Amino acid sequence: MIDEILRDAEQRMKKSIELLRQELAGIRAGRAAPSLLEHLEVNYYGTPTPLNQLATISAPEARLLVVQVWDRNAVSAVEKAIRQSELGLNPSVDGQTLRIQLPPLTEERRRQLVKLVHEEVEETKVAIRNIRRDALADIKELLKNKEISEDDERRAEQRLQDLTNRYIAEADKLGKQKEHDILEI
């Protein structure tokens, strides 16, 4: 039962870290990266659709993204989604191809992005701690129902804490990496 609780907690913590990876990939660093636009939602025939399901995104140059839209009718919807995103990008349309020149990041914008990274990392750490809290409650419930001994409870709590520390360290590492990428000129 304890192993099941810990396994469930670890799975949920892994999902939190994966979500953080996706969020950080969407935050622009100094160079163009297709991941910046991949999960951008496009209103495609009334349905929110990720951009990577409507187009091929590439970065042929350090400050240029090229979006090759597969459906001619979706070009204006893709352009609108990119313009309205919080990324501050201005695509130029050439047939079914959108070219997006990325302006160099100003020092102020870099600081804003670093702040955003810190917020995302903190959100993930809070989510991980909430997962720990839920698992602890489950362990306490087992003790209360006399399904485990106090020694088992203490060992389970220690294993859970080790798990929590590992995933929080992972979140911090991802945040520091992204911060370094943003501040790198």
Curated annotation (Swiss-Prot):
<dbReference type="GO" id="GO:0005737">
    <property type="term" value="C:cytoplasm"/>
</dbReference>
<keyword id="KW-0648">Protein biosynthesis</keyword>
<dbReference type="InterPro" id="IPR002661">
    <property type="entry name" value="Ribosome_recyc_fac"/>
</dbReference>
<dbReference type="InterPro" id="IPR023584">
    <property type="entry name" value="Ribosome_recyc_fac_dom"/>
</dbReference>
<protein>
    <recommendedName>
        <fullName>Ribosome-recycling factor</fullName>
    </recommendedName>
</protein>
<dbReference type="InterPro" id="IPR036191">
    <property type="entry name" value="RRF_sf"/>
</dbReference>
<keyword id="KW-0963">Cytoplasm</keyword>
<comment type="function">
    <text>Responsible for the release of ribosomes from messenger RNA at the termination of protein biosynthesis. May increase the efficiency of translation by recycling ribosomes from one round of translation to another.</text>
</comment>
<dbReference type="GO" id="GO:0006415">
    <property type="term" value="P:translational termination"/>
</dbReference>
<dbReference type="Pfam" id="PF01765">
    <property type="entry name" value="RRF"/>
</dbReference>
<comment type="similarity">
    <text>Belongs to the RRF family.</text>
</comment>
<dbReference type="GO" id="GO:0043023">
    <property type="term" value="F:ribosomal large subunit binding"/>
</dbReference>
